[in-house]
């Protein structure tokens, strides 16, 4: 199925879409050499084959089968496990330069540790090789809401520091098996959202929470568990990053005596030559603005940035949590030992930014008074989404929010390299293939990235649209869509069809859009 084989049908609509975004004066050539454009998915949302070839359940399997995503689950999803060649061909036809996907930990290591599943290993080798054959960079996420259920059952998953050992061993396996072809690694997806949804509100795996903060809570403690989970995720991320730098990236042979280097260093040099990648972490962000110009609302907005972004990035840059968090959360916030602080500080090569929406922020300091506390009372704000936005509606088009986040990361954390790992527009799955709102959204946000890069000096390295195709969504199952490609979930073959946004993105990437140059505008 060649992507542009039905371009003639879409030409009038593409022209209409271009008219709608005619004020966005930029082209692919305005971005610097080395900047990559891609799209993304995650394992449970797209692979299917949930019970095939040795894969065992993850916490997302259990979550979905408990009915948390309605009646749907990811047992089949888009069946990329069997259709990866077709999907990579569609990516190549579209002109994608990179594909962000995640590895299913429980497909590769069915027990969470120990022996590798040969069929799982073969699948990811095949996918990576197919991408490279078509000139597409593989960008790999190691954990995307899908911890092996075996580890959750054994010791409580991310609530136990035992997870640091097992995650590091899992990362080591991935670096060893795929690192000769994969140069971009994200350890954990949306650390903050995973912790809040899974351990405070109970609306994402593993669905832990406590009243009155969560919904239908049967286990958990919303007051402390989110903070414990993030603490252990940061330690696990740091451990994996240090492992990569010490065993797969840093050349150690120079310090070895020549007498033992003859036999040993040859192997070492071969290994190190192939390992030249970078390791980062992913953070969900909101573009936050004060509801009023009052001092309290401005301070509240600063707290939102501290609690959502600083919760993750502050330890990685400065070795500790933000002072506002330590003050408001108190003893419920785990403390880094001196050794742990040294380990997490600097343990990243890039920051993965995820951004969809913007917030108005109002001070609510009175929420600090109750005896029962959780993240939402600790942050002490009232937040309202900008525009007519909810998980039920299309997102408001607020590209300034992404610009704001990129500027904040630059100014607060020393302008680290950044990849936009997710950004996209939601529509009902039943909506038309003529997704003009998605075209407008993507074109606006891509221009915002260019502005942040060329006018503000943010060190942005790439942009990944979410998602490549309609997938099994965490909120809404198959009823909500972010895809460039429509997937007919009622068709046994799960037919893929390019939407208008796919044609627009393809035209942009191939340089066939005729916007005036941003540099000359």
UniProtKB/Swiss-Prot annotation:
Residues reported to bind a beta-D-glucoside: 45, 144, 189-190, 356, 422, 466, 482
Matches recorded under InterPro entries: Glyco_hydro_1, Glyco_hydro_1_N_CS, Glycoside_hydrolase_SF
EC number(s) recorded for this UniProt protein: 3.2.1.21
GO biological process entries: carbohydrate metabolic process
Keywords: Disulfide bond, Glycoprotein, Glycosidase, Hydrolase, Signal
Enzyme class: hydrolase
Positions bearing carbohydrate: 216, 221, 364, 388
Pfam families referenced in this protein's UniProt entry, alphabetically: Glyco_hydro_1
Cystines in this chain: 209-217
Keyword Cell membrane among UniProt keywords: no
Positions of the catalytic residues: 190 (proton donor), 422 (nucleophile)
Tagged with keyword Amino-acid biosynthesis: no
SUPFAM superfamilies according to UniProt: (Trans)glycosidases
Catalytic activity of the protein: Hydrolysis of terminal, non-reducing beta-D-glucosyl residues with release of beta-D-glucose
Molecular-function GO term, any one: beta-glucosidase activity
Residues annotated as signal peptide: 1-23
PANTHER family given in the database record: BETA-GLUCOSIDASE 11, GLYCOSYL HYDROLASE
Protein name as catalogued: Beta-glucosidase 11
Native organism: Arabidopsis thaliana (Mouse-ear cress)
Lineage: Eukaryota, Viridiplantae, Streptophyta, Embryophyta, Tracheophyta
